[in-house]
Amino acid sequence: AGAVALGIVAGISESRWIFAFVAFGGLIVAFYNLGLWNNRFHTDLWFAFSWGAFPVLTSYWVNASRLDLAAVLLAVGCFLLTLTQRTLSTPVRSIRRRAIKVEGEIQLANGERLTLDSESIIAVPERALLLLGAAMVVLAAGLLAFRL
């Protein structure tokens, strides 16, 4: 609601074009969060577009008053980063929330056996998520430093 209110103020004071971004953003939030239209917008691809690419396109347009190749490339990069995060986090979240029991083992070629449990299965994707989060903070800081 706050973003929509700010968008309306910006649309009135700056440019009517912002209303397109405000309307689309409002629809994305409603359709995704409420599962409208048979959950067609509640997918990994829509998540990546809605929370990765779309904010980049919106903020780029607000700052440049145009969308160009740089905006598209930045949006695609953020789409892919968000999709990566979603790909890693979905199975981890599923194991944490829904698994009652996880057991098994991996037998290596040298005869060694590694025990599988929920913690060992989610350890690698969780570490990747932590590193991805840290990378985004450093990337954002670098972009900010570049602009200052």
Residue locations for each model-derived region?
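Hydrophobic alpha-helical transmembrane segments of multipass integral membrane proteins
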Residues: 4, 23-30, 76-79, 134-141
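Intramembrane alpha-helical segments
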Residues: 1-63
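Juxtamembrane boundary at the C-terminal end of a transmembrane helix
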Residues: 140-148
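Multi-pass membrane catalytic core of lipid/isoprenoid biosynthesis enzymes
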Residues: 1-17, 110-139
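Cytosolic, membrane-interface loops and tails of multi-pass inner-membrane proteins
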Residues: 85-125
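Functional transmembrane core segments of multi-pass inner-membrane proteins
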Residues: 48-94
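Cytoplasm-facing juxtamembrane segments at the starts of transmembrane helices
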Residues: 39-47, 98-99, 122-132
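Alpha-helical transmembrane segments
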Residues: 13, 17, 24, 33-37, ...
